[in-house]
């Protein structure tokens, strides 16, 4: 089930994740390396109707796809509640590409962003 959004996230190829995550960015002092932490609370990918193994998170937009394999499930009282994914960039072009995806994803989902100072 794919949507007509210009930017989307998928854990299973061809199936968009409707739950919008909290996203936290961390960068090195020189700005060249860093990571984005995605935290999904009760995502559809963990529902009982979803079959298959999660092998990564795909960030898809009009430019293509960014893939991270760093995905973990967090359990509360034995139930899978949170899905955590980490995307790491190692250079400025990768960061710039990620930010283009993030801006497109925010627009597609009616979101904004704020900086902690």
Swiss-Prot record:
Lipid bilayer topology: Peripheral membrane protein
Keyword set includes Thylakoid: yes
Organism (species): Prochlorococcus marinus (strain AS9601)
InterPro entries in UniProt: Psb28_c1_sf, PSII_Psb28_class-1
Principal location: membrane
Location(s) in or outside the cell: Cellular thylakoid membrane
One GO term describing the cellular component: photosystem II oxygen evolving complex
GO biological processes: photosynthesis
Subunit (UniProt): Part of the photosystem II complex.
NCBIfam families, alphabetized: PS_II_psb28
Encoding gene, per UniProt annotation: psb28
Name of the featured protein: Photosystem II reaction center Psb28 protein
PANTHER family registered for this protein in UniProt: PHOTOSYSTEM II REACTION CENTER PSB28 PROTEIN, CHLOROPLASTIC (PTHR34963:SF2), PTHR34963
UniProt entry keywords in alphabetical sequence: Membrane, Photosynthesis, Photosystem II, Thylakoid
Highest taxon of the lineage: Bacteria
Record Pfam families: Psb28 (PF03912)
Family: Belongs to the Psb28 family.
